[in-house]
Swiss-Prot record:
Superkingdom of origin organism: Bacteria
InterPro entries reported for this sequence: PduO/GlcC-like, PduO/GlcC-like_sf, YBR137W-like
Name the UniProt record assigns to this protein: UPF0303 protein BMEI0598
Family: Belongs to the UPF0303 family.
Gene3D superfamilies: Haem-degrading domain
Organism: Brucella melitensis biotype 1 (strain ATCC 23456 / CCUG 17765 / NCTC 10094 / 16M)
Amino acid sequence: MAQGDDNKQAIGQIIRQEQALIFPSLDENDAFSLGQRIRDIAVKDKLGIAIDISLWGRRLFFAATAGATADNTEWLRRKFNVVRRFHVSTYRLVLEQNREDRMFAPYKALDVADYALAGGGFPIRVSGAGVIGAVIVSGLPQREDHNLVVRAVAEHVGQDPVALALPAA
């Protein structure tokens, strides 16, 4: 199958993820539980990552595991800005933009210092409220960052993570 076809299938699956992974509500306890779930997976699998769960105006959870770097924290900020701007998964945008330079097209006027075209950011969509924040992971290859977030969010909201997972690249 051609790369373009693979991307189209992955984009379709990510859209399904975004439509299925709706939180009934989200408060500080939910954010802590979700963040701890991601951290537990990372520690068990020895993944060096940074994790951020934030609403538009307020951080609810942050953690880093052994192996994460200061750069990962900066990537969290830049991925968060992308989710805040577009209200969709950052990996979906990576596949839709399909740019080797990993920068947004110039007409979008998004400074690379503030916006990262990289997977690992996922919108927090609350039933009846819409997108209110983002769950972000940084430290793995971008598809793996995305998959880790989707797995944890799916488990948290009672969806089947296997049914929602992207196929191996």
